[in-house]
Amino acid sequence: MKTQVTKARLEAKVNIDIYELLKQAAAITGRTLTDFVVSVAYEEAKKTISEHQVLRLAVNDQALLIESLSKPFEPNPSMKNALDVYEAYLSITGKNNDK
C-alpha cells in the first residue's frame, strides 16, 4: 500500500549575517526560525505568482485590444439604427453636427 507524501524538505545554506537576521526576526515574532522562513517565503511566493498572473493577463488583454482595433469596424444593426435616428433628429431640429 502506497502512502501519500504530505511534506517536503527544504534546506538552504545562507551567509551567517542573513542567518542571524532571520533568527532575530523569528524571535521577535515568537516563531521558530523554520516557521518564520517558511511563512515569509510562502507569502512572497503567493505575491510573486499573483503579480505574474496579472502581468500575463495584461499582456493578453493588450494583444486582444490590438487585434480588435486593427480589424475594420462594422456597426451592428442596433448601432446602424441609432445612427439613423440621430441623423433624423439632426435633420428635424436643423442642427448640424459638422461644427
Swiss-Prot record:
This protein's UniProt keywords: Toxin-antitoxin system
Keyword Nucleotide-binding: no
Record-linked Pfam families: TacA1 (PF08681)
Biological processes per GO annotation: regulation of DNA-templated transcription
Presence of keyword Disulfide bond: no
Function, as annotated: Putative antitoxin component of a toxin-antitoxin (TA) system; its cognate toxin (usually a tRNA acetylase) is unknown.
UniProt record similarity statement: Belongs to the TacA antitoxin family.
Protein name: Orphan antixoxin protein TacA
Organism expressing this protein natively: Haemophilus influenzae (strain ATCC 51907 / DSM 11121 / KW20 / Rd)
